[in-house]
Amino acid sequence: MNIALGVLVLLNSFIAGTEPRDGSHVRTLDKGLRSVIDEGLARSASFRGLVARLDGSDVIVYVEPECPMSSRLFGRLTLLGAGGDRRYVNVRISCMLPVTQQIAALGHELRHAVEIADAPSVIDDASLAAEYRRVGFASRAARSGAGYESRAAIDAAHQVWVELAHTAE
């Protein structure tokens, strides 16, 4: 946990000067992922809804690409910790996916971030595990065996995918 807090302090210092002008709680420094987020916002009402819920919460989401990512995963979320009146998560999305799959994968991970936002008690790995025993289940896709999944996140990815299929690129 001390390492995560150290990373959190570094991230907070680094990101402080690059906070989005619109104040969004979903942030990235990667130009490609900025385009993915923008396209998700433009083409999917569900994606917009997830971002809006996070923007109204105490959770800040930092989105980064991961290359390569395990072939069993499209994305993953890590709880970085809590500080002050904020909680911080890191989302990594596979850069090997086509843009529409990246948007759907990000929608899935943003739903997990909303689940964290909806549970104020989630402030560390132990409380995250307790919350997912309540709202989700263990994921076999995680390399470390400490991964979690929820039906709501699976459904969110599917809904975003459906909405993307019904809008022009």
Predicted features, each with a name:
Residues 2-16:
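Hydrophobic h-region of N-terminal signal peptides that target proteins for export
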Residues 7-11, 114, 164:
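Structural signature of transmembrane alpha-helix termini at the membrane-water interface
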Residues 110-126:
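Catalytic Zn2+-binding segment of zinc metalloproteases
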Residues 14-40:
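Short N-terminal segments immediately surrounding and downstream of signal-peptide cleavage
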Residues 108, 112, 149-150:
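Histidine-centered active-site/metal-ligand motif
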Residues 90-106:
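Short pre-active-site segment immediately N-terminal to the catalytic Zn-binding motif
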Residues 42-83, 100, 126-169:
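Metalloprotease/metallohydrolase-associated module, dominated by Zn2+-dependent proteases
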